[in-house]
Amino acid sequence: MEVFMQTTSWFQRLPKGSAQLLALIVVLLVNSLVAHNFFAIHLQDGRLFGSLIDILNRCAPVALLSLGMTLVIATGGIDLSVGAVMAISGATMAHLTIEGYSLPMVFLGVLGVGVLCGLWNGFLVAIFKIQPIVATLILMVAGRGIAQLITQGQIITFNNDVLAWLGSGACLWFPTPVVLTLLAALLTWILVRKTALGLFIESVGINIRAAKNAGINTPAIVISTYVVSGIFAAIAGVIVAADIRGADANNAGLWLEMDAILAVVIGGTSLMGGRFNIWLSLLGTLIIQGVNTGILLSGYQPEWNQVVKAMVVLVVLMMQSPALLRWIRQHRVAGETHHV
């Protein structure tokens, strides 16, 4: 018992983000034991290649989802529809491209899909007071049907050099999706940390009634977080569809909302709302993709990914449990009193 209390106290004294960074390092080191030259990176045809670069590239769509999900969860909400929004945006992009629309019109159409989906979720939660998990579940279910209606139940393929570059090209030696994700993260950080928006979001998550009494337009704040989440989900859908040069309404973004939620929770944002850190959420996505890659490199079946993720969710939620935290505080006080 005393060893557990000392370990807990030691972890709490570490700088913020140390636990996530340590977890990522451990995952990568374990991967290096099962894969030869895991840390090797080489430049070929103006682009970096290697297992580490592959992890960055593969986690880009989930990282985009986690940016929006972080803001939504910080308000005390949740967005289960991001995977379906990815499917709708990918289907919209493919349809508009095949119909001969210009790229600016295609991108405007895709972003419009993200905004509309975000507004739908936001209004259901903030205006009609529907529980976030129920409100977003509606679009999660209906969204795939909408995507299938757009594609008429088929996988639509297209061929466009610019879109191909967005999905599988390179920019400044790194995969284009990685660069886009970093730019999105930087813009989000500026938006929430260099303006009052971040403080308003945290205030709503901590105590929405107190925030409203303080003069904060709480419905507008909640709706804005869902709109941002919808936009990032739409961009993620573009990347996934552009990567395979096609729109698969059935599988695009399937269950990625769970990875995004897990990444945010691993990053330290409580599902009850409140303080958040987008950079730690991105670390969470790297940890998840590192685990996925390690399982594949080890030769285990991909289904083990879901088992491991479920175990991680259980551990993280237990660590955030108010009952467990209260028990730790009580035993710490009792221990200090005993020593005195």
List the model feature ranges, each with a label.
Residues 1-33, 186, 206-209, 213-220, ...:
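Cytosolic-side transmembrane-helix boundaries in multi-pass membrane proteins
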Residues 6-15, 75-78, 98, 113-158, ...:
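Short loop segments and helix-boundary regions at transmembrane helix junctions
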Residues 12, 42, 128, 132-195, ...:
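Transmembrane helix-bundle core of multi-pass membrane transporters
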Residues 16-17, 103, 132-134, 173-181, ...:
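Loop-to-transmembrane alpha-helix initiation sites
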Residues 31-32, 48-99, 123-130, 264-278, ...:
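Single transmembrane alpha-helix segments in multi-pass membrane proteins
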Residues 37-54, 147-150, 192-198, 226-263:
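Inter-helical junctions in multi-pass inner-membrane proteins, predominant
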Residues 102-110, 116-121, 125, 172-248:
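Helix-loop-helix "hairpin" substructures at the membrane interface of multi-pass membrane proteins
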Residues 233, 244, 248-310:
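Transmembrane alpha-helical segments in multi-pass inner-membrane proteins
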